[in-house]
Amino acid sequence: ANNTVSIAQAQFEPKAWFRGIYADETPVGFIMLFDDPDEPVYFLWRLLVGAEFQGMGYGRQAIAHLVDYVKSRPNATELKVSHVPELPGNPGPFYQKLGFEYTGEDDDGELVMRLKL
């Protein structure tokens, strides 16, 4: 989903935690988490970085900040994300470089990855 759809979804989901990603004053992306402090597993719902800003470290920095945030939450033991491997720009290798591992789960065609905290 694009930024507009993601922001609209976040407005109607009380457990959505979302932030813009900026380079100084320039918006370069968007990150959204399903934030349920009653659960030990948190889910990275969206990470969107504009094509012209990819490969510049913004996504990596956003994930690092997100991991710090999740570690501060009660009961947090892992952060999960899923992706469709057949789509262009498959983010699997990006997440693997950040320490995420495949779980073997398939969530409706999306491969699930996890980062133990």
List each model region and its residues:
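Acetyl-CoA-dependent GNAT
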Residues: A1-W45, G50-E52, Y69, R73, ...
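Active-site acidic-Proline motif in GNAT/NAT acetyltransferases
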Residues: G50-M56, P85-L87
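Conserved acetyl-CoA pyrophosphate-binding loop and the N-cap/start of the following alpha-helix
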Residues: F53, G57-H65
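Conserved alpha-helical elements of the SDR catalytic core
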Residues: L66, V70, L98
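Conserved GNAT acetyl-CoA-binding A-motif
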Residues: V70-V84
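Conserved beta-strand-loop-alpha-helix junction that forms the acyl-donor binding cleft
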Residues: K80-G92, D108-E110
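Conserved acetyl-CoA-binding loop of GNAT-fold acetyltransferases
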Residues: Y95-E105
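Short beta-strand-to-coil "C-cap" segments at the C-terminal boundary of structured domains/repeats
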Residues: R114-L117
